[in-house]
Amino acid sequence: MPSSISWGLLLLAALSCLGPGSLAQDAQETEASKQDQEHPASHRIAPHLAEFALSLYRVLARQSNTTNIFFSPVSIATALAMLSLGTKGDTHTQILEGLDFNLTEMAEADIHQGFQHLLQTLNRPNTQLQLTSGNGLFIHQNLKLLDKFLEDVKSLYHSEAFPTNFTNMEEARQQINSYVEKGTQGKIVELVKELDSDTVLALVNYIFFKGKWLKPFNEEHTREEDFHVDEATTVRVPMMNREGRFHLHHCSTLASWVLQMDYLGNATAIFLLPDEGKMQHLEDTVSTEILSKFLKNRQTTRVSLYFPKVSISGTYALKTVLSSLGITKVFSNAADLSGVTEEAPLIVSKALHKAVLDIDEEGTEAAGATVGGITFMSRPKEVIFDRPFLVVIYEHHTKSPLFVGKVVNPTQQ
């Protein structure tokens, strides 16, 4: 009976305030942009991450159209790519192809260099945006990993290695959960509920994101309003309101309103509100090319925007989801992880992923000053996010989708 890797994935998105506007370009960002132009490695993998994100989203959406969806394609892809360093044969090929990489078109070294640059960029200090990522290897104290695997995951993926006593399952579980809780500043606790008895290695990835909107909503304008979960279900939610000029337009191809909201710093959220009865059309039609055009070509419209406060999370056992994308061998007795250790055959027994999304008016660290809205002589057009919508959050410098989700019920954790 082979030993197993219990592989845990984690991320947090704490999106704490909402507001329109263009990004502030300070000296820090200008320098960051120069670095990215000199080292565009992460740009080369960005289109593949975007395709992987939509593929994964569609698998999750097919599983249920009545629940919230929220996950980080960057977090999941990073952990998979890191694991691929220790795989061989079909196990290796399935992982990289499942991430939308074609090894005849992109050298494997370029893929890992892209992730290396991505992680360096995400962890770059920023006074306006909190964005950090971490990778942890929890290794059975009696398990000897191959030196090359350890060197590669440390140099390319900035992974930390922790000796772990997996003979004491509760102690090991607490060690992993403490690492996760600290990395996400207490937002995600108890990621790992239990470990399999033959676990000898755990791979953990987390992303912590906390952003402030450039022009937050005025809390005084928030009112309890109806949100239509489906034709038969309505819930009351705190509905924020702001009048002004927004990066907003109606896309006839998607039959949806497209709203772009910039964070202070280097991230943007795209919200897609389908017309009545058009959610399935939106999910079937949206593509990476369309989303890329939205980011490049913005349209500004004067509206009165109504947007719900959101607090949702997504928790996923990824084995079934990844299998739908062709990543199967790594979870089977046919797995080849001989690049990790030569001591015993390994399989991945568990792949866990959790994400949390919070959106409100001011943000958890908003300054005391109140930013007023623009007042118009005549009432502008109203756009009301009072039914299910999609969200994609991008990091500008790497052009990568950090988070993807669907808000079906803003009050459902």
UniProtKB/Swiss-Prot annotation:
Ranges where the record places region RCL? 368-387
Any Pfam family: Serpin
**Gene Ontology CC:** extracellular space
Keywords assigned by UniProt?
Answer: Glycoprotein, Protease inhibitor, Pyrrolidone carboxylic acid, Secreted, Serine protease inhibitor, Signal
Give the function comment from the record: Serine protease inhibitor.
UniProt cross-references to SUPFAM superfamilies, sorted A to Z: Serpins
Q: Which InterPro entries does the protein's record reference?
A: Serpin_CS (IPR023795), Serpin_dom (IPR023796), Serpin_fam (IPR000215), Serpin_sf (IPR036186), Serpin_sf_1 (IPR042178), Serpin_sf_2 (IPR042185)
Q: What protein family does this chain belong to?
A: Belongs to the serpin family.
Q: In which tissues is it expressed?
A: Expressed in liver.
Which parts of the sequence carry Pyrrolidone carboxylic acid? 25
As for subcellular location, the record says: Secreted
Query: Which protein is depicted?
Result: Alpha-1-antitrypsin-like protein CM55-MS
Primary location recorded for the protein, binned into one broad class = secreted
Write down the glycosylated positions. 65, 102, 165, 266
What does the UniProt entry state concerning the protein's domains? The reactive center loop (RCL) extends out from the body of the protein and directs binding to the target protease. The protease cleaves the serpin at the reactive site within the RCL, establishing a covalent linkage between the serpin reactive site and the active site of the protease. The resulting inactive serpin-protease complex is highly stable.
Molecular-function GO terms, alphabetical: serine-type endopeptidase inhibitor activity
PANTHER family, per this entry?
ALPHA-1-ANTITRYPSIN (PTHR11461:SF165), SERINE PROTEASE INHIBITOR, SERPIN (PTHR11461)
UniProt keyword Secreted, yes or no: yes
